[in-house]
Design a protein with these regions (language model features):
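Hydrophobic alpha-helical membrane-insertion signals
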Residues: 2-46
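A short glycine-rich, His/Asp/Glu-containing loop-to-beta-strand
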Residues: 35-93, 168-174
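NAD(P)H dinucleotide-binding glycine-rich loop of Rossmann-like/cofactor-binding domains
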Residues: 61-64, 106, 132-135, 148, ...
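Catalytic micro-motifs at enzyme active sites that drive phosphoryl/nucleotidyl and oxygen chemistry
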Residues: 76-78, 103-106, 128-135
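A short beta-strand-loop-beta hairpin characteristic of the jelly-roll/cupin
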Residues: 90-111, 123-126
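Conserved, well-structured core segments that form or line functional sites
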Residues: 141, 148-174
Length: 174
C-alpha cells in the first residue's frame, strides 16, 4: 500500500495518536456520492452527503472536484467565502487552482500538489482557476477533504501551505 512521505514532517500539522478511550469504528453504510455544483458552478461529488457528522468526526466532508474537461471560458471557482474551526486539504490530480486568503496566504497548485489551509479562528478565501485555464480550457480534477479541528485548536491562528508534488514521495509498505 502506498504511503506518502515528505522531507520534513514538521511541515504538516500533527495528528495525535488515538487514546485508550478511542476505538476502531466499523463501516455503517456505503453510499454513492451525489453529484452537484459548488461555488460558481464547478461539478462536485460530495462523498459524505447525508452522513451524521458525529459518525464522521474528525472529518466534515470530502468533495471530488471534476473530473471535467473544460472548454474555453468554462472553468469556474468560488467567490470569497468564510471558514472557521477546521482545515481544508485540497489535492489536484489534473489541472490548476489558485487560492488567495485574508491572512495573506495563497498560491497556485497543479498536478499532484496539495494545499493545506487551517481556518482556525476564521479566514476568508477564494479558489479560482487561473486566467490561462479560463482562456484555453482544459482538464480539471481534484479532491478536497475538510478536517475538524479539536476544540482546543478551533480558534488557532489561520495558516496556509502548499505541498508540491516534487516534495512528496510514495513508499510501498510491506
Amino acid at each position: 500500500m502506498p504511503a506518502i512521505t515528505v522531507d520534513d514532517i514538521l511541515v504538516l500539522p500533527r495528528v495525535e495518536e488515538p487514546g485508550l478511550a478511542q476505538a476502531e469504528r466499523r463501516v455503517t453504510s456505503v453510499t454513492t456520492a451525489p453529484s452537484g455544483y459548488e461555488g460558481e458552478g464547478f461539478p462536485v461529488r460530495r462523498a459524505f452527503a447525508g452522513v451524521d457528522l458525529a459518525q464522521l468526526d474528525p472529518f466534515v466532508h470530502m468533495d471530488q472536484m471534476g473530473e471535467v474537461d473544460y472548454g474555453p471560458g468554462e472553468p469556474k471557482g468560488t467567490a470569497w467565502h468564510p471558514h472557521r474551526g477546521f482545515e481544508t486539504v485540497t489535492y489536484i490530480i489534473d489541472g490548476t487552482f489558485r487560492h488567495q486568503d485574508s491572512n495573506g496566504g495563497g498560491g497556485l497548485i497543479t498536478n499532484g500538489d496539495t494545499q493545506w489551509m487551517t481556518a482556525g479562528g476564521g479566514i476568508l478565501h477564494i479558489e479560482a482557476p487561473p486566467e490561462d485555464l479560463v482562456m484555453s480550457g482544459g482538464l480539471f480534477h481534484g479532491f478536497q477533504l475538510w478536517v475538524n479541528l479539536p476544540a482546543r485548536l478551533k480558534l488557532t491562528q489561520p495558516r496556509y501551505q502548499d505541498i508540491r508534488a516534487r516534495q512528496v514521495t510514495g513508499d510501498e509498505a510491506e
